[in-house]
């Protein structure tokens, strides 16, 4: 089995990126476990195949995954179908008010790949509700980033210890 944690992220305003970077910092607790943080636009099937577990980080736009993250899944879906079965994953969603639509969409894709969810989706709600607030750069509170860091650490520990 391949090893390592792959974190795939798309972010327009910085929230999902900050979440992914916090998770990567948490994953660094396992020094022997390779952790890669890739932009969704740069990640591909070979990156998925080379990893033993995944963390997907994206904003929710209009109750769905952001376009670039959806494009990542569209590009990779069939090339890795039936080749990732049973591998663990978790999700980080940055949302203005809800996040559950994107989380459900990601879970459906992961089910098709036969991935195994090892944590509930971690949704950070920014409260952005006006066009100006939605488009503005985001700076997340320390407690939200700490939750992301803890999830990254848990995934890395589970992978390194053979728990997942």
What feature does the model see in each segment?
Residues 2-28:
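N-terminal beta1-alpha1 ligand-phosphate binding loop
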Residues 4-6, 36, 90:
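A structural signal for isolated positions on well-ordered beta-strands in alpha/beta enzyme cores
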Residues 13-14, 93-98, 141:
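Short histidine/acidic/glycine/proline-rich micro-motifs that form metal-
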Residues 19-27, 106, 151, 155:
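Hydrophobic residues within alpha-helices
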Residues 20-33, 111-116:
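Short helix-loop-beta junction
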Residues 31-42:
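A short beta-strand-loop structural module common to alpha/beta enzyme folds
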Residues 41-125:
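Helix-loop-strand module that forms the ligand-binding subsite of alpha/beta enzymes
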Residues 44, 118-164:
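Glycine-rich phosphate/pyrophosphate-binding loop and the adjoining helix
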């Amino acid at each position: 089995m391949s090893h390592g944690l792959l974190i795939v992220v798309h972010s327009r305003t910085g929230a999902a990126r900050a979440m992914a970077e916090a998770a990567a910092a948490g994953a660094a607790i396992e020094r022997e476990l390779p952790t890669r943080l890739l932009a969704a636009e740069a990640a591909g099937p070979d990156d998925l195949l080379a990893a033993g577990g995944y963390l997907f980080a994206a904003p929710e736009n209009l109750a769905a995954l952001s376009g670039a993250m959806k494009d990542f899944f569209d590009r990779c879906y069939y090339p890795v179908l039936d080749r990732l079965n049973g591998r663990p994953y978790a999700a980080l969603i940055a949302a203005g008010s809800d996040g559950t639509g994107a989380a459900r969409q990601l879970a459906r894709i992961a089910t098709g790949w036969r991935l195994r969810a090892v944590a509930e989706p971690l949704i950070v709600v920014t409260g952005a509700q006006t066009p100006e607030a939605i488009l503005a750069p985001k700076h997340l509170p320390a407690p939200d980033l700490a939750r992301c860091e803890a999830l990254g650490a848990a995934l890395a520990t589970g992978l390194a210890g053979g728990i997942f």
